[in-house]
Amino acid sequence: MSAKLISVTKPVVEGVNTAEELIAYAARVSNPENQINNKTASGLLKYCIRHKHWSIFETAFMTLELKTSRGIAAQVLRHRSFHFQEFSQRYASVMETPPPHQARFQDHKNRQNSLDTVPEDDQTWWATEQEKLYAQSMELYNKALEKGIAKECARFILPLSTPTTIYMSGTIRDWIHYIELRTSNGTQREHIDLANACKEIFIKEFPSIAKALDWV
């Protein structure tokens, strides 16, 4: 699971140098004489967050490249306010064998949770069996392609753990909501890891907003 910055809004207004400054600039649309006031921008952003004036955070945009599994990608794609481009198994061959994933016990008190208490012997068994299955799956997939079977047909035998790449684009308001939701309890562990990788990039690009959100 990883995330990488692809693009972030670059203002062309003189005196407005970052996407974060642009959000503050847009927030002052009704006060044009004071729009370019970067000294008080962080305080304004904090005020807007405290009072839930979220619309200003729709004036800047960020795109990240996410490396994850098809299983987690299905959860990511449910965030419909975003715009996505995903690696197509229909048009491109899958070259990478999935890595084994951690085993966790089902939490019977909370079905959204899993418990990291699986014994080491069972973890080893689980990893070994996954490696066997993934090797068989990739062998069958590649054999199908060699026989001329279309990628769109051969892909159906690939497991949900198959790696994929997604470009995820959204407003800063979208990213705040996504990160808040997917780093919280009730999210699958692997998705939390991915959302935290996104959060690290967000903090670097939008330090004042991140501070106002108590992320740092």
Curated annotation (Swiss-Prot):
The active site is at R182. Pathway: Pyrimidine metabolism; dTTP biosynthesis. Homotetramer. This is Probable flavin-dependent thymidylate synthase. The keyword NADP applies. It catalyses: dUMP + (6R)-5,10-methylene-5,6,7,8-tetrahydrofolate + NADPH + H(+) = dTMP + (6S)-5,6,7,8-tetrahydrofolate + NADP(+). It is an enzyme of class 2 (transferase). Residues 1-216 form the ThyX domain. A motif (ThyX motif) lies at residues 78-88. Binds 4 FAD per tetramer. Each FAD binding site is formed by three monomers. Catalyzes the reductive methylation of 2'-deoxyuridine-5'-monophosphate (dUMP) to 2'-deoxythymidine-5'-monophosphate (dTMP) while utilizing 5,10-methylenetetrahydrofolate (mTHF) as the methyl donor, and NADPH and FADH(2) as the reductant. Keywords: FAD, Flavoprotein, Methyltransferase, NADP, Nucleotide biosynthesis, Transferase. InterPro entries: Thymidylate_synthase_ThyX, Thymidylate_synthase_ThyX_sf. DUMP binds at Q75, V76, L77, R78, E86, F87, S88, Q89, R90, R155, R182. One of its GO terms (biological process) is dTTP biosynthetic process. Pfam families: Thy1. SUPFAM superfamilies: Thymidylate synthase-complementing protein Thy1. CDD domains: ThyX (cd20175). Its cofactor is FAD. Its EC number is 2.1.1.148. PANTHER family: FLAVIN-DEPENDENT THYMIDYLATE SYNTHASE.
